[in-house]
């Protein structure tokens, strides 16, 4: 088979795919090795890292095979392989090594080599050490609807930093996996490019650095540290609120990094326009790239998390027990992991098999608090107060949008936060049919992923109800 088939295939893909997608994922690839096998052919394509390989397999492999088959006049199978890479330079004997445990915030990752000076800016910065939490990777992150968009965007950045979605702003409640996701990007890039300059830190560490350098009048050191990065990962930028000097220095670093096409990923508990006491210059830039939310995990995702985490702990959890725990622990991944540890510890100490009865006993305090706090009546009152309508409107037949909308939101929350069935919820909303409740649940649930304002309102209501 002619080697020209691959170049012709790329030319066709360039016309069929959006330009940015083609330039990000297809153009940088080396030419495929084409082997004729009689009635069929194999195109071996070597991809530089696991993340690009998985993404190309899931998003483009079928399209590539179709184009190559058409050009070759016979079926072509795409064989994706990881490209061999030279081992990175050995660290000096006195360089700290990663121990795999969570590390203190604000640590350097990777050092630029002289051979890569064109790609990475050198600066008089501290000697880097590999201090990311190596356990927080894409492989250990359980995917689901709640984190689908954020995970997809993070994979894009890991595969092609500085190209698209810059900055990437990830927001959501406590314990939903934002930190895990940005560590995963850092670990992915570090594995692909060991000489990249990467820095993960919490916003409070940046504030501390600004204060320290302000006191010492050493702002050149601050610039050398932050302006020379290839990837900045910063958690909880809402902590910058009201700190004008910190915001000024972060703005300068932000502009310097974007100018050199370094990538910035931030997390927050709210979307950019919802950040209080932060300069509009910053929030407008936060919003200029891609803003994505991580939602509380849905039931199936919670079950998957429990099953995966329990396997890692070496004590697999039966599926029926995982469903029981997942139905009763809804807030976030952190609480879910806490519940799992309680169940596993209880089983270990009591030397009993893990079953629903044991899980109920292990979590009795948690279940008691939840049952006492979240009821349909409490939801109705909380939602009515939030939207400034009467509680009686929840049961009435009134249909103006100012009443119908909060009523649908209350039905949605009743389904999400209680164990009530659809008919039971309908009965508590003035004897409505279960199909009415189902419509409300689907409508609000569907809009939540698209409507930032609605999502924020629901987040506030959920946090209020859960105490």
Swiss-Prot record:
Please list where the region (Domain I, interacts with DnaA modulators) is annotated. 1-74
Q: Which SUPFAM superfamilies match?
A: P-loop containing nucleoside triphosphate hydrolases (SSF52540), TrpR-like (SSF48295)
User: Which residue ranges are recorded for the region named Disordered?
Assistant: 85-127
Q: Name one GO biological process term.
A: DNA replication initiation
List positions binding ATP.
Answer: 175, 177-179
Q: Where is this region: Domain IV, binds dsDNA?
A: 348-467
What GO molecular function annotations does the UniProt record carry, in alphabetical order?
ATP binding; ATP hydrolysis activity; DNA replication origin binding; lipid binding
Pfam families named in the record: Bac_DnaA (PF00308), Bac_DnaA_C (PF08299), DnaA_N (PF11638)
Map out region (Domain III, AAA+ region) in residue numbers. Answer: 131-347
> Which cellular compartments is it found in?
Cytoplasm
Cross-referenced Gene3D superfamilies, in alphabetical order?
1.10.1750.10, 1.10.8.60, 3.30.300.180, P-loop containing nucleotide triphosphate hydrolases
- Which GO CC terms are listed, alphabetically? cytoplasm; plasma membrane
Q: In the UniProt record, does the keyword ATP-binding occur? A: yes
Region Domain II: start-end pairs: 74-130
What task does this protein carry out?
Plays an essential role in the initiation and regulation of chromosomal replication. ATP-DnaA binds to the origin of replication (oriC) to initiate formation of the DNA replication initiation complex once per cell cycle. Binds the DnaA box (a 9 base pair repeat at the origin) and separates the double-stranded (ds)DNA. Forms a right-handed helical filament on oriC DNA; dsDNA binds to the exterior of the filament while single-stranded (ss)DNA is stabiized in the filament's interior.
Record's domain comment? Domain I is involved in oligomerization and binding regulators, domain II is flexibile and of varying length in different bacteria, domain III forms the AAA+ region, while domain IV binds dsDNA.
**UniProt family annotation:** Belongs to the DnaA family.
Assembly and interactions? Oligomerizes as a right-handed, spiral filament on DNA at oriC.
Protein name in the entry: Chromosomal replication initiator protein DnaA
Q: Species name for this entry?
A: Methylibium petroleiphilum (strain ATCC BAA-1232 / LMG 22953 / PM1)
Its gene is dnaA
